[in-house]
Amino acid sequence: PESETYGRIPNRYVNKDDVIYNTADGNLWFVREVWEYLQYTGDVDFLNSMWDVIKLAIESDIKNRTDEFGFLLHGDADTWMDARIKGQQPLSPRGSRANDIQVLWYTTLMIGSNIAKYLNQEEISNEWKEKANTVKVNFISYFLNEEKNMIADCLKEKNTQDFAIRPNLFFTFSVPKLLDK
């Protein structure tokens, strides 16, 4: 429980001595895909068998990897844009709060809330839904720049908006729709 990687799904696992966690979205895609599987199959037994893993993934992210705005924090190259120059410096440094990760985080919290409700875990459902709403409100406040009519790719130090044009922007329109306009 004290490890910084506690509750994270690794990016790569070779053996217990060779585990790489350079992914911010492993937990997020896992929860989303369990939900998709349930929607497709109706396999409630599978959902029940995954509940403890889902709960651990979300709770460890809440406890260990969120900031005061509810944003999920990550390494500079821990998104799917994880290429590095000679294995060192990120090719596309995106700070610790990239837009696609925040949208997936919002989605994960909403799906987690739905799963918890489905499994009669009302208190957890309400808590995760409230956290999702916090992420949504803060995403709109910090990532959306109405003057430029743009969404920031990521937030840098002191919440400075980075308007680099990257394909990750499309996540904000589709996974799920986070913005009303």
Regions found by a protein language model. Give the residues of each.
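Aromatic-rich carbohydrate-recognition surfaces in CAZymes
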Residues: 1-75, 98-106
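Glycine- and aromatic-rich loop/turn segments at beta-sheet edges
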Residues: 2-16, 63-90, 141-158
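Catalytic cores of carbohydrate-active enzymes
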Residues: 65-74, 95-97, 104-181
